[in-house]
């Protein structure tokens, strides 16, 4: 980011949380959990940690919305909700009907917050709903 700021006057930096979508990278949070659970491989989980997850299609929709406005040099695009790691694991277990095998680790880290440019007005315009079903719907969409 500093490289871009120093060298380009006209720029936009877009930051995202963990994205849910089709990705060949096995080390993304969602692929890691899905691959370990579906193959019954044991893993460690900070079950009390919270993560911000966003469907990649919603990320694109929000990105284009902000880029059209042309008034931001830096944009933080995120879900308004944070999900406990245990909830993410449980939703994947429910989808594939395989119990996760994991060691519970205590969270040594402070859960982080993102200064989010996304607000309810924008979500209403774009018809994006971060409701109770958002996480499970997004997981089903890409991992079913």
Locate the predicted segments by residue.
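Short, glycine/charged-enriched secondary-structure capping and boundary segments
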Residues: 26-31, 60-61, 90-92, 117-118
